Curated annotation (Swiss-Prot):
Protein name: UPF0473 protein LL0144
Extent of the signal sequence: none
InterPro entries given in the database record: UPF0473
Family affiliation: Belongs to the UPF0473 family.
């Protein structure tokens, strides 16, 4: 199955940050790498985050997190929701858009 890259995403060069609070109340700061408009295909938007304090693995890779979100009716930011592991179409789209974004960053 092929997927065209027709999703809008933010190429903002000024980094934005978000603080996430885990179930134990610990706060962690993340940089927002990219937001993806998936409204037309999936009815929600997505965000890919990178911890501001991270360690690369032995291959030089860094773990990133992806969440879905819907904006509040007044246009303000909404809540982040985990993306189900079995939502293969959503994960495929996120991976494709994120990889394209990373390729553009390397140019």
């Amino acid at each position: 199955m092929t997927h065209t890259h027709d999703h809008e995403h933010d190429h903002n060069h000024e980094p934005d940050y978000i603080t996430l609070v885990d179930e134990n109340g610990n706060e962690s700061l993340f940089q927002i790498l990219i937001t993806i408009d998936g409204q037309e295909e999936f009815g929600k938007n997505y965000v890919v985050l990178q911890p501001t304090e991270f360690e690369e693995d032995e291959q030089g890779l860094i773990d990133v997190l992806a969440y879905s979100f819907t904006e509040n009716a007044d246009g303000t930011e909404g809540d982040l929701q985990p993306i189900p592991e079995d939502a293969e179409d959503e994960w495929d789209m996120i991976e494709e858009v994120f990889n394209s974004f990373m390729d553009e960053q390397e140019d």
